[in-house]
Amino acid sequence: MQAERGPAGNRCRMGVTVEKAERAGVETSHARRFRNFVGRSLVPKSPVLLSLRNYILLTPPVFALRFHLRRLYWRLTGHKLQQLVKGQGVESGFVAEKVLPYNLGNINIINRGRTERVIAILRSIRGLKLGALNTLVVGPRNEAELLLLSSYGFDPAKLTAIDLFSYSPAVRLMDMHELKFSDSSFDAVYSAFVITYSDDIPKAVAETIRVAKDGALVVFVYEHLALGAGNRFGKNNLSNGPDDLLALFGANAGHVFWKEDFESEGSYTSSVVFRLTKPKA
């Protein structure tokens, strides 16, 4: 017996297809309602609670052990400490002669508090999927910041870190004033306690804008002193806090998720999280 052909047969097949689609839609709707009921009424989910694995990895003894074992591993496998020098990766004498030696002296310090406070802000932004972001991390000093970011939701495979020195393959040698990346390469740029070491902040900002995508998440945190006091190297960069930094981004600074200038004992910690906007080509 042949299947019915012609307009009537087509209508029959279309009717079956529509019926199947409607049934699938009803089943999906029921499944969604059930998940919502379980997730909201029976076992409410937390949007910020860590997995048991990551909780254990972040406990102080375990985290410190991970950090030091990785440092030892890179040393034993022949990854020697490398650094940029003036004329070979760094053009600024100020950065090469003052900033680099100072930060090299602090290469073994783990600043968990500073990093985790910033991460807490990011994890509070509704709908932000940290693991999906191809992120540039500027100036981590060592692997601690990268371990923290990955333990709190960033995908380690999508983290690209740069600094003036490095003992790890996870951190590339590069100056934030001259980034070796193509335009619009990153979904996010994370720069914590780095920008005020610059003696040419507008250039560093311009490079950030260049390598970030339109709509990228931009995160800056830094310390500055009271107006006129000068910083550790005699400069007083961004003395008016996040407003000064946002002014440098100008029209490229879009929606601001977070902005703070916190004072403690005469020193200020500024933090700002915003969307980068770029003019349409």
Regions found by a protein language model. Give the residues of each.
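A short SAM/SAH-binding and catalytic strip from SAM-dependent methyltransferases
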Residues: 188-200
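Core SAM-dependent methyltransferase catalytic element
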Residues: 257-281
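Class I SAM-dependent methyltransferase Rossmann-like catalytic core
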Residues: 65-128
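A short glycine-rich, Lys/Arg-flanked "PGG" loop and its adjoining helix->strand segment in the class I
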Residues: 202-214
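Class I SAM-dependent methyltransferase SAM/SAH-binding core
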Residues: 134-178
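Conserved Class I S-adenosyl-L-methionine
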Residues: 230-257
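A short acidic, Gly/Pro-enriched loop at the edge of an enzyme's catalytic core
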Residues: 177-189
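Conserved beta-strand signature within the Rossmann-like core of class I S-adenosyl-L-methionine
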Residues: 215-224
